[in-house]
From Swiss-Prot:
Free-text remark on how the cofactor is bound: Binds 2 magnesium ions per monomer.
Organism name: Alkaliphilus metalliredigens (strain QYMF)
The protein, known as: Anthranilate phosphoribosyltransferase
Gene this chain is encoded by: trpD
Catalytic activity field: N-(5-phospho-beta-D-ribosyl)anthranilate + diphosphate = 5-phospho-alpha-D-ribose 1-diphosphate + anthranilate
Amino acids binding Mg(2+) 1: 92, 226
PANTHER family the UniProt entry points to: ANTHRANILATE PHOSPHORIBOSYLTRANSFERASE
Organismal lineage: Bacteria, Bacillati, Bacillota, Clostridia, Peptostreptococcales
GO MF assignments: anthranilate phosphoribosyltransferase activity; magnesium ion binding
Pathway per the UniProt entry: Amino-acid biosynthesis; L-tryptophan biosynthesis; L-tryptophan from chorismate: step 2/5
Superkingdom of origin: Bacteria
UniProt: anthranilate 2 binding residues: 166
Keywords: Amino-acid biosynthesis, Aromatic amino acid biosynthesis, Glycosyltransferase, Magnesium, Metal-binding, Transferase, Tryptophan biosynthesis
Cofactor(s) required for function per UniProt: Mg(2+)
Matching InterPro entries: Anthranilate_Pribosyl_Tfrase, Glycosyl_Trfase_fam3, Glycosyl_Trfase_fam3_N_dom, Glycosyl_Trfase_fam3_N_dom_sf, Nuc_phospho_transferase
Regions that span the bilayer: none
């Protein structure tokens, strides 16, 4: 099965959903060798992944994941594919606290660093959040503080079979794309940053196929997998079953352009202190970056009627100290749940 799939993809032929599901099942059940996984992932990346191939893979990964039950109709996740090589601070992690403080249920799904200096799990841990939670404990966090964090390796244990091949390859593969698509809480809304402009519409289509109701798939034209403040951003928005494509400019929202250097992060300690300063009200380029992305999260989470309204609400909750409160609530509760 694996040899045929590799051969087909090398010849730049797309796989049908059933074929892709069979390949992913084999990988997730440890039935495929590392060299086969590496060969397949490389060939697939060179061919370019289709909506069908990505959807099929996400379905298999979701079926193998531990489940988190969230009874909120507008729960969201904020994360990107990573792989933009930009080494910015953890923008989507800061955004999660702001959106939750604005009343959006945020169930964040993340990992330690893969392609950056510091992943969301690294920075949350440095901030004092206990990331080692069971599905039930994450559910408790969501019920009590309106947000929770799922540490990907704990919830996607079958991923361990692909880990060695991915590490040895060291390049972006379909797994970078799959991370944000396999949230164990099956959230209904997503702001999803992608590392490649050509992926915005593809990923919006995949979100629709997976049953997501509201989504903004974004790619900064400076290469960032976020809505950027250094230039314009391409957006594919999923709403009411329809996908619309457009470009936004931060200046439309009275946000001045920022230099990319102003968005630089560092290790977990540095990024934790950046996030802390932002939720404490520090102004400047980093705050503006969080505002525009949190605005999108608040809009997608149905707590604002437009991106502008979302941005205004984001500024309000930071300035009122509510985002800092949300961070402290998650730290306190997650530590109390330690077993």
């Amino acid at each position: 099965m694996m040899q045929q799939a590799i051969d087909k993809v090398i010849r730049r032929q797309d796989l049908a959903e059933t074929e892709m599901m069979a390949v992913m099942q084999g990988i997730m059940e440890g039935k495929v060798t590392d060299s086969q996984i590496g060969g397949f992932l490389t060939a697939l990346r060179m061919k370019g992944e289709t909506v069908e191939e990505i959807t099929a893979s996400a379905k298999v990964m979701r079926s193998k994941a531990l489940v988190v039950e969230v009874n909120q109709p507008h729960s969201i996740d904020t994360c990107g594919t990573g792989g933009d090589q930009a080494n910015t601070f953890n923008i989507s992690t800061a955004v999660a606290f702001v959106a939750a403080a604005a009343g959006v249920t945020v169930v964040k799904h993340g990992n330690r660093s893969v392609s950056s200096q510091c992943g969301s799990a690294d920075v949350l841990e440095k901030l004092g959040v206990n990331i080692d939670l069971t599905p039930k404990q994450v559910e408790t966090c969501v019920e009590q503080v309106n947000m929770g964090f799922m540490f990907a390796p704990k919830f996607h244990q079958a991923m361990k079979y692909a880990a060695a091949a991915r590490r040895e390859l060291g390049v972006r593969t379909i797994f970078n794309i799959l991370g944000p698509l396999t949230n164990p809480a099956k959230v209904k809304g997503q702001v999803l940053g992608v590392f490649d402009e050509s992926l915005t519409e593809v990923m919006a289509q995949v979100l629709k196929e997976l049953g997501v109701e509201r989504g903004m798939v974004v790619h900064g034209l400076d290469g960032l997998d976020e809505i950027t403040t250094t230039t314009k951003t391409k957006v594919s928005e999923l709403k009411n079953g329809m996908i619309s494509n457009y470009v936004i400019d931060p200046r439309q929202f009275d946000i001045p352009l920022t230099d990319k250097e102003d968005l630089a992060g560092g290790d977990a300690e540095k990024n934790a202190s950046i996030i802390l300063n932002i939720v404490k009200g520090e102004t400047g380029g980093k705050r503006n970056m969080v505002l525009i992305n949190a605005g999108a999260a608040i809009y997608v989470g149905n707590a604002a009627n437009s991106l502008q309204e979302g941005i205004d609400r984001a500024a309000e909750v930071i300035d009122m100290g509510l985002a800092l409160d949300k961070l402290n609530q998650l730290i306190k509760l997650s530590q109390e749940l330690k077993v």
